[in-house]
């Protein structure tokens, strides 16, 4: 019985007797603020028989590739200030890019620590274990930013973060395996994560920005229940954080 719920809802919401097949892009519009911002698109195919995620197989078209780039997996990154659209079938996302020439300083709490968590550095099996690894300890999943700031900036005579020569920081040398790292390679020198960590170090490895906003909530899309059927049994998610200054 479950398999007929989505088609029935679609029929009730349309004036025509059958659902119109096509692509839906989410979100309908978005603002990218600064060169480090990014957006994960969600591409959904709907017809009278199924709802399927096509985020990683869809062929996106960017009206102005000079303003944004979009990967095959639906990841959008800014290139220059302006307004453009990304299209898929009849669906369209309006993208506005601002702040490329004057990026905000890297936030230790909202950018540096999340990158380290995503790389697995603060996981319980790595430096987030109770005693750390290799004389380097981070709080588990960055629950204690003050402790993490101390170990990253103050310990090891400042060798973990070197603002004068950022590339020689152990925080970059270890995960790229430029020097021996028991945990193996975690970071690519050409990746956005490497660029962010390098920028944070080059800016002086600041631990707090003045009047820094706080996260007030998150939104996960798709938010509605979905029944996925083989072979279309995968689903891409996007998570948007909302901050106290009104940005997301």
Give the label of every model feature segment.
Residues 20-248:
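Aromatic- and Gly/Pro-enriched helix-to-coil junctions and flexible linker segments
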Residues 5-16:
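Bacterial N-terminal signal peptides
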Residues 1-2:
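N-terminal secretory signal peptides that target proteins for export/translocation
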């Amino acid at each position: 019985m479950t398999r007929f719920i989505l088609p029935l809802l679609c029929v009730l919401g349309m004036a025509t007797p059958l659902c119109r097949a096509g692509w839906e892009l989410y979100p309908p519009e978005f603002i990218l603020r600064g060169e480090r911002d990014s957006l994960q698109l969600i591409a959904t195919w709907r017809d009278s028989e199924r709802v399927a995620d096509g985020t990683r197989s869809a062929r996106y078209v960017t009206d102005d590739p000079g303003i944004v780039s979009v990967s095959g997996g639906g990841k959008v990154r800014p290139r220059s200030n302006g307004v453009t659209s990304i299209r898929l079938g009849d669906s369209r996302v309006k993208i506005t890019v601002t702040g490329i020439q004057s990026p905000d300083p890297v936030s230790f709490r909202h950018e540096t620590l999340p990158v380290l968590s995503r790389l697995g550095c603060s996981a319980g099996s790595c430096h987030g274990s109770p005693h750390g690894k290799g004389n380097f300890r981070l709080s588990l999943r960055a629950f204690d930013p003050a402790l993490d700031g101390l170990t990253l900036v103050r310990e090891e005579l400042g060798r973990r973060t070197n603002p004068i020569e950022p590339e020689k920081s152990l925080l970059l040398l270890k995960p790229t395996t430029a020097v021996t790292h028991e945990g193996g390679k975690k970071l690519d020198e050409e990746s956005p994560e490497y660029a962010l960590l390098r920028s944070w170090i080059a800016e002086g490895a600041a631990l707090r920005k003045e009047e820094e906003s706080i996260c007030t909530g998150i939104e996960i899309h798709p938010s509605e229940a979905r029944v996925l059927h083989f072979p279309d049994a995968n689903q891409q998610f996007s998570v948007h954080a909302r901050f106290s200054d009104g940005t997301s």
